[in-house]
Amino acid sequence: MDSYEYGELLKELSTKRDNIAKIIKPDSIENRLGEIEALEHSEGFWNDATKAGEVQKEKRKLERILKKYEEANQAINDAKELFEIATQDNDEETLGLLFEESGHLEKEIKSVEIEVMLSGEHDGSNAIITIHPGAGGTESQDWASILYRMYLRWAERRGFKVEVLDYQEGEEAGIKDASFIIKGENAYGYLKVENGIHRLVRISPFDANAKRHTSFTSVMVSPEVDDDIDIEIEEKDLRLDTYRASGAGGQHVNKTESAIRITHIPTGIVVQCQNDRSQHKNKATAFKMLKSRLYELELAKRSAEYDSMEKSEIGWGHQIRSYVLAPYQQVKDTRSNIAYSNIEAILDGDLDELLEGVLISQFDQPGE
């Protein structure tokens, strides 16, 4: 890196800093924190534990965003001042130190961008994930099971809990369907970018001729919504089916039809649960899953992205990422347009860099 490149980097990071300020409005955050402090000292505030908890959650989020912004802002201002002085004095030693620290400066801004992208209304929620293989039988079902393991490993790496709701094992290998909840801070915020079609290209382990095969699997992610969110679901729009739990995925096997499948006829959304021995509990969980999916659909309808998507894409999703194992190894995301060569690590749950790359690419898009 030379002085020209560093100067250009400072301009780029300053622009990003200014864009962040326009979005988060630091002065407004400080005003809101002042209002919260006054609330905390008001009579009877702590008597309503639920309301107090919501306010405290908002406070922590605002404090975290403001702190990260202020740290990044200060770091850029300090770097600018030091760079100007060092350039005027031709201080090679200081310039060298600034160049070495440039990566840290970029990370400061990246950290704020990610924090902003995780500040949506439901980003802090748990994530309900449903994985469904595309056409292709065993090949696609095996790919679905690889993705299932990838998300479970990601959750494990972050110390998040996983609750399996439904797991339908494939006849030869893989899975026909899987639904599960990942429970942890910002689980939905991170995983919301996984909505869509995931494409795999590899030499098939199921092909005696060792030919290259392409498989597709759909991943659907929705926030675990609170019970108090009002989503109208009419009984006439539902079809309920019962079936026996399959016993795969560490779940129990039983001889009664305790598993529940609910089809929402107007949208075609299907949810199913076999997590519990009780049909009543499975039905309650399935309704919660349906509620989350309908809420996610409503959010999509409100977004500008919805207007540009075909109806077929809404129902099935759109291709978001390719995983190529042969003839070369690469994972490429269509949103961030970033390619990664560490495909084995990614499939083993090392997803943070990839997820953050998508979040930041969305932050940089006009209108985000």
UniProtKB/Swiss-Prot annotation:
Subcellular location: Cytoplasm
Keywords, ordered alphabetically: Cytoplasm, Methylation, Protein biosynthesis
GO cellular component terms listed in the entry, alphabetical order: cytoplasm
Entry keyword annotation includes Cytoplasm: yes
Post-translational modification summary for this protein: Methylated by PrmC. Methylation increases the termination efficiency of RF2.
InterPro entries: PCRF, Pep_chain_release_fac_I, Pep_chain_release_fac_I_sf, PrfB
Pfam families xrefs: PCRF (PF03462), RF-1 (PF00472)
Residue numbers bearing the N5-methylglutamine modification: Q251
GO MF annotation list: translation release factor activity, codon specific
Family stated for the protein in its record: Belongs to the prokaryotic/mitochondrial release factor family.
Cross-referenced PANTHER family: CLASS I PEPTIDE CHAIN RELEASE FACTOR, PEPTIDE CHAIN RELEASE FACTOR 2
Role of this protein: Peptide chain release factor 2 directs the termination of translation in response to the peptide chain termination codons UGA and UAA.
Matching HAMAP family: Rel_fac_2
NCBIfam families assigned to the protein according to its UniProt record, in alphabetical order: prfB
Name of the protein this chain belongs to: Peptide chain release factor 2
Organism: Wolinella succinogenes (strain ATCC 29543 / DSM 1740 / CCUG 13145 / JCM 31913 / LMG 7466 / NCTC 11488 / FDC 602W)
Gene: prfB
